[in-house]
Amino acid sequence: INGDAKGTVFFEQETSEAPVKVTGEGLGLAKGLHGFHVHEFGDNTNGCMSSGPHFNPRNKEHGAPTDENRHLGDLGNIQAAGDSPTAVSITDSKITLFGADSIIGRTVVVHADA
């Protein structure tokens, strides 16, 4: 998270077949919905510009987290209250911490809006 916003996100997966639990907290986000995505590259030298597009190794269309046809990096939105910490609590069965499609080493982007 760049700018005045900051936060920490944790990814946990018990086995390669298990869903990934995403938890964490963001501070300083403006009130409202913020897109929450894994991007292709782990490069943050130029902020989000160097992180590349959403992680999409299977060349799918952009979609909601519950859609079968979606980028692997499409994790939906998080809701910020604006005056308190923003909780992140997502369980996702498409992303993985194992194998060729692993999200390890990539960038998590919290967008300015949904």
Swiss-Prot record:
User: In the UniProt record, does the keyword Metal-binding occur?
Assistant: yes
Q: Name one Pfam family in it.
A: Sod_Cu
**Residues that bind Cu cation:** 37, 39, 54, 111
Main localisation, per the record? Answer: cytoplasm
Region (Disordered) residue spans: 48-68
* Localization (cell): Cytoplasm
Gene3D superfamilies given in the database record: Superoxide dismutase, copper/zinc binding domain
Q: What are the GO MF terms of this UniProt record?
A: copper ion binding; protein homodimerization activity; superoxide dismutase activity
The record's remark on the cofactor is: Binds 1 copper ion per subunit. Binds 1 zinc ion per subunit.
Q: Which cofactor does it need?
A: Cu cation; Zn(2+)
GO process annotations (BP): determination of adult lifespan; positive regulation of mitophagy; regulation of synaptic plasticity
A Gene Ontology term for the protein's cellular component = peroxisome
Catalytic reaction list:
2 superoxide + 2 H(+) = H2O2 + O2
In short, the EC number is: 1.15.1.1
Q: Tell me what this protein is called.
A: Superoxide dismutase [Cu-Zn]
